[in-house]
């Protein structure tokens, strides 16, 4: 027993009273687009496996093959003796697909944002305190990276480029390198940044653009390689993950050769972490072969999003500015979100309730994540269940 167990218990009780306590639930494998949870198989509308690749046979086969040939682990960090030829092979393939000089693999999206940003700001400190402009709805890992670096964030209104440009113009004469840190697709709202306009704005103001492509990679942009590909000349740094649209694990940054070489020398999350293992690299490599050829699956996925948003609007449920495979059903009250999620689960569908502090108070929601593994039948089930479930929640309120 810990000496602080009474404090931990009190904190959990307070979270339960606010209807924001979390609990782990045991899941087991099921066919793509589904999940076996607590002994029941549910249609899964909470997974980030947007293209249904997590159970694709090519990923599993190559993961197994590379593990058999090269071992279960990389044995060390890459700067010690864990830099396998496989890492460089995957990075070269990724850089070609992203249209950048280089790419660098990291262990997770959180690790990338939390470690890469401080490394960038450290280099920039030679010119004085950096100016860091961040979207108000950025992911927690981006905020964490800024906080870890000790920089002050200058926050602009969500996806409001006019406000961002105003803030940049206000500080035009101030010393220090300038950074814009934002996402191309926002994970809780499913809306997109105007990446070409962002890149043009960054160029006008001589500002480094850091773009988190976690939820765009695999789904959006040329060949599914993210929205940075829509900007002439690209962006300064694109971060993305392999754990969502690519059905595997890990993360990357893509940019100039000088940038990636610098991160090898300055990014703590790269330097002090054991390298990704061969099985993971094999799955990533296979996904990179598949994704550019999946335009039809991407079109169907985004079409399902359009149909779902139209249905939610007809029911009077707010889905914000979503324009992607992520569609929030924003119901406001945390209790209502939990009740609606429970009603859907009773009907055989998993759509997890998202509550504060993940989203602002008063904006609790179901975060509905669509997948190419879902067909019209599953979408029909979801639309019908949402309509009936929302009626039941309102009647009980």
Swiss-Prot record:
Pyridoxal 5'-phosphate binds at residues 109-110, 187, 212-215, 241-244. Gene3D superfamilies: Aspartate Aminotransferase, domain 1, Type I PLP-dependent aspartate aminotransferase-like (Major domain). One of its GO terms (molecular function) is 8-amino-7-oxononanoate synthase activity. The modification N6-(pyridoxal phosphate)lysine is found at residue 244. It comes from the Bacteria. Substrate binds at residues 22, 139, 358. One of its GO terms (biological process) is biotin biosynthetic process. Its EC number is 2.3.1.47. Its cofactor is pyridoxal 5'-phosphate. Pathway: Cofactor biosynthesis; biotin biosynthesis. Keywords: Biotin biosynthesis, Pyridoxal phosphate, Transferase. It catalyses: 6-carboxyhexanoyl-[ACP] + L-alanine + H(+) = (8S)-8-amino-7-oxononanoate + holo-[ACP] + CO2. InterPro entries: Aminotrans_II_pyridoxalP_BS (IPR001917), Aminotransferase_I/II_large (IPR004839), AON_synthase_class-II (IPR050087), AONS_Archaea/Proteobacteria (IPR004723), PyrdxlP-dep_Trfase (IPR015424), PyrdxlP-dep_Trfase_major (IPR015421), PyrdxlP-dep_Trfase_small (IPR015422). Belongs to the class-II pyridoxal-phosphate-dependent aminotransferase family. BioF subfamily. Homodimer. Catalyzes the decarboxylative condensation of pimeloyl-[acyl-carrier protein] and L-alanine to produce 8-amino-7-oxononanoate (AON), [acyl-carrier protein], and carbon dioxide. This is Putative 8-amino-7-oxononanoate synthase. It comes from Bordetella parapertussis (strain 12822 / ATCC BAA-587 / NCTC 13253).
